[in-house]
Amino acid sequence: MASFRIRQFQERDYKQVVDVFSRGMEEHIPTAFRHLLTLPRTLLLLAVVPLAIVLVSGSWFLAVVCIFFLFLFLWFLASKPWKNYVSKCLHTDMADITKSYLSVRGSGFWVAESGGQVVGTVAARPVKDPPLGRKQLQLFRLSVSSQHRGQGIAKALTRTVLQFARDQGYSDVVLVTGLLQQGAVTLYYSMGFQKTGESFVDILTWLVDVSLIHFIYPLPSAQKYEL
């Protein structure tokens, strides 16, 4: 098993961090596309539109061409939420990681390093408006390079955030992940996270049925933890 270490983000990591994160998100596009093809509304679209063209024009060739363009359109729909998400992240908090995380009290950004290369990332920062009486930390940007999965890196990065939350006196760690990100969903359940709900970001994510799962990991108080 290849060795790795978890450490705090440094400015020299930026390009590799962006690459690991972007690739990690966009690799879910094929899964989203296959999922979209199984939806009843998609199957209805693929059946009705070509049939209508045959009935109107009498041309099977036009129907085949129509199916080809429908598949292109469906690929575009499946990929759009993931590309939008990556673009939004790179233009907001990940545009300046030091400013967004390392310069903010109670926040952090860590990388997993193996062989001198960044192979994983994770970030955390305080929830702005937590429930009354709770101090919550939100986990963000968990991603591991596809060539380094199965080595426990994602679990180690998540544990780093949990330990940070304990040390900082947080009451909960919360996060949101996509239903189609089955590796992440399985990881969080195995580590004791509890599902609190599901949601859609917008009409596009509803249309392609890419829902988000909300998780929480309750922590003992700092005082209890020290005991």
From Swiss-Prot:
* Residues covered by the N-acetyltransferase domain: 69-217
Q: Which reaction does it catalyse?
A: L-lysyl-[protein] + acetyl-CoA = N(6)-acetyl-L-lysyl-[protein] + CoA + H(+); an S-substituted L-cysteine + acetyl-CoA = an N-acetyl-L-cysteine-S-conjugate + CoA + H(+)
One Pfam short name: Acetyltransf_1
- Write out the GO cellular component annotations: endoplasmic reticulum; endoplasmic reticulum membrane; endoplasmic reticulum-Golgi intermediate compartment membrane; Golgi apparatus; membrane
| Pathway in which this enzyme or protein is active | Sulfur metabolism; glutathione metabolism
**Positions in the Cytoplasmic compartment:** 1-35
Enzyme kind, highest EC tier: transferase
Q: Which domain of life, per UniProt? A: Eukaryota
Task: Provide the GO biological process annotations.
Answer: gastrulation with mouth forming second; glutathione metabolic process; negative regulation of cell adhesion; peptidyl-lysine N6-acetylation; positive regulation of gene expression
Q: Which residues lie on this side of the membrane: Lumenal?
A: 57-227
**Membrane topology term:** Single-pass type II membrane protein
The keyword Transmembrane appears for this protein: yes
Query: Where is the protein localized?
Result: Endoplasmic reticulum-Golgi intermediate compartment membrane; Endoplasmic reticulum membrane
User: Which E.C. number(s) belong to this protein?
Assistant: 2.3.1.-, 2.3.1.80
Recorded GO molecular functions are: L-cysteine-S-conjugate N-acetyltransferase activity; N-acetyltransferase activity; protein-lysine-acetyltransferase activity
Following inactivation of the gene, the phenotype reported is: Nat8-deficient mice are born with Mendelian ratio and do not exhibit any apparent physical abnormalities. However, Nat8bb-deficient mice exhibit activated macroautophagy.
Its job: Endoplasmic reticulum (ER)-membrane-bound lysine N-acetyltransferase catalyzing the N6-acetylation of lysine residues in the lumen of the ER in various proteins, including PROM1 and BACE1, using acetyl-CoA as acetyl donor. Thereby, may regulate apoptosis through the acetylation and the regulation of the expression of PROM1. May also regulate amyloid beta-peptide secretion through acetylation of BACE1 and the regulation of its expression in neurons. N(6)-lysine acetylation in the ER maintains protein homeostasis and regulates reticulophagy.
* Protein name from the UniProt record: N-acetyltransferase 8
- Protein's gene: Nat8
